[in-house]
Structures are given as C-alpha cells and as structure tokens.
C-alpha cells in the first residue's frame, strides 16, 4: 500500500494531529501548521480524484509536517501559506487516501502499543461465525462497519464472508492485539470514540456490534449514542448483548434513528452473545 508521504513525494511525515480521532479538530492543527516557514516549493497538497483537498504538508527545519483535511475544511491561513510557498499539488483516489490515513495512525498503534492478552478462543470464534452466516449469509460484498471491534473477531469473520471491514474501538491495546493476531488490519481499523462514529465512517451495507455492553442504567447514556451511530450508518445491522434487557434497550435506540431491529435468542453462546438484535 502507498503511504501518504509517498503520495506527495515527501520524506517521513510528522502529523500535527497526535491520533486519528484528532483529524476532526477544526482548530489547533490549522493554527500550528501555519507557524511553519517553508521555502519556495516546500509545501504539498494532496487532492482526491474529485479535486477535494485531503492533506497539507510543509517542510520546515528539514522536516515535513502534515495535517489532515480528510474530515475538515482547509483554513484561509493554510491556503495562503501554500500559495506563499508556491507549493505543489498531487492527486490520488479517495479510497486509497483513506486507507493510507488509517495506516498512518493505526500503524503507530501496532508498533508502539503493547497488545492486550488474547481474549478469544476458537470455540467463541466459531460460535460468532455461525451466527453471522445465519443472519447475513455467505458470499457477501460491500463494506461492513465493525463497531467497538475489540480485537477484531467480527472483522475477521466478515472479511472471510467477502466484506471489506471498517472497524473502530477506543481501546488501543485491544486494537494492537487485533493487529498482532491478524484479525484486524492497520488500513482497516482506527481508534475513535464510537459515540461520534459517523464523523469518520461512511454509510455501509453492513454493520456489526459483537458483545456490546455490559450495559447498566448508569451507562445507558454512553451506549445509546454508540448504538444510534452504528444503526444510523448501516443498512443491515447486527448487535449482540448478554441480557434480554440490554437487547430491548438496543431495539429502542435503533428505532430512534428509524431502524427496526428484531430481537432473538442465540442459544450458541450462554454468556457473551446470548441476545441478538438484527434488521
């Protein structure tokens, strides 16, 4: 896969944003990068195939510094700095740029974060595989959003069934485990807050949330937006929880964004995925 630095013919990039989740920040990155004083020709903008700007980089003190425009609009000051430096523009397909951004930040997680201890057994994986095949079928195609993906059990199975997973979780140690085990890929998964997933994720054909919870009365305000976000951006959605009460909460929250999920009991797993919401 082509890295962002290679796309703009630059050396290693130092991003203003410390992590992928910060790419939606409309304030500080734009201010900080404009403190640079690039020489003529030492500025780059990366456009997608439709001419949308996605990345801005400048060279200062011998190093390339970058900020992402994947989820925000360039500021007037940034564009002025580019023009002053008489910078160059490059162009790549948007999907390739998105993958490269995910790789940029998730690759650092894989390299620098110690993975959590293995949390899956072959028996558990097979139970989830059987459930997903029952609900979705086989020979699938399209994108599958894997919400609160953990170490990637859902992504690995949906990839086997033909989907292209896009996964997220807010636990970088679990993500690191997923990367080291091969269940997750660094260009397919990111560390973000699932309560604002639609700020980063596209609409998708499929959505899964394996073992959501545990949900309690005092954590419902956390889980409700997570469910609403996943249900709101996916056409077919499957969420598993441990208790029937949690399943009814999930059904209610999905209905709030116009989605009808039906509840069923999953006898394969007496603990983690006992109740299924699907629709």
Task: Give the positions of each predicted feature.
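Conserved alpha-helix/loop element of class I SAM-dependent methyltransferases that forms part
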Residues: 119-141
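N-terminal accessory interaction module
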Residues: 2-100
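A short SAM/SAH-binding and catalytic strip from SAM-dependent methyltransferases
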Residues: 204-220
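Conserved SAM-binding motif I beta-strand of class I
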Residues: 164-169
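Conserved beta-strand signature within the Rossmann-like core of class I S-adenosyl-L-methionine
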Residues: 234-243
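Conserved SAM-binding strand-loop segment of SAM-dependent methyltransferases
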Residues: 184-196
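Conserved SAM-binding loop of SAM-dependent methyltransferases across substrates and taxa
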Residues: 151-163
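Conserved class I S-adenosyl-L-methionine
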Residues: 139-150
């Amino acid at each position: 896969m082509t890295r962002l630095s290679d796309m703009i013919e630059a050396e290693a990039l130092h991003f203003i944003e410390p992590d992928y989740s910060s790419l939606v920040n409309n304030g500080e990155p734009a201010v900080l990068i404009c403190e640079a004083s690039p020489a003529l020709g030492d500025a780059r903008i990366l456009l997608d195939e439709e001419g949308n700007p996605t990345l801005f980089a400048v060279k200062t003190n011998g190093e390339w510094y970058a900020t992402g425009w994947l989820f925000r609009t360039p500021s007037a000051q940034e564009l002025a700095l580019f023009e002053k430096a008489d910078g160059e523009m490059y162009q790549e397909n948007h999907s390739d740029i998105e993958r490269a951004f995910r790789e940029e930040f998730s690759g650092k997680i894989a390299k620098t974060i110690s993975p959590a201890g293995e949390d899956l057994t072959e028996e558990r994986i097979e139970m989830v595989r059987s459930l997903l095949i029952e609900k979705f079928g086989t020979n699938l195609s399209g994108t599958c959003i894997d919400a609160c993906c953990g170490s990637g059990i859902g992504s690995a199975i949906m990839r086997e069934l033909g989907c292209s997973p896009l996964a997220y979780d807010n636990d970088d140690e679990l993500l690191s485990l997923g990367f080291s085990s091969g269940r997750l890929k660094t260009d397919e998964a990111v560390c973000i807050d699932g309560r604002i997933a639609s700020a980063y994720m596209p609409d998708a054909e499929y959505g899964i949330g394996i073992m959501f919870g545990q949900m309690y009365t005092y954590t419902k305000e956390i889980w409700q937006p997570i469910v609403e976000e996943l249900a709101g951006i996916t056409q077919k959605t499957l969420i598993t929880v441990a208790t029937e009460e949690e399943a009814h909460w999930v059904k209610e929250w999905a209905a709030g964004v116009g989605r009808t999920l039906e509840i069923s009991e999953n006898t394969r797993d007496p603990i983690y995925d006992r109740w299924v919401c699907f629709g």
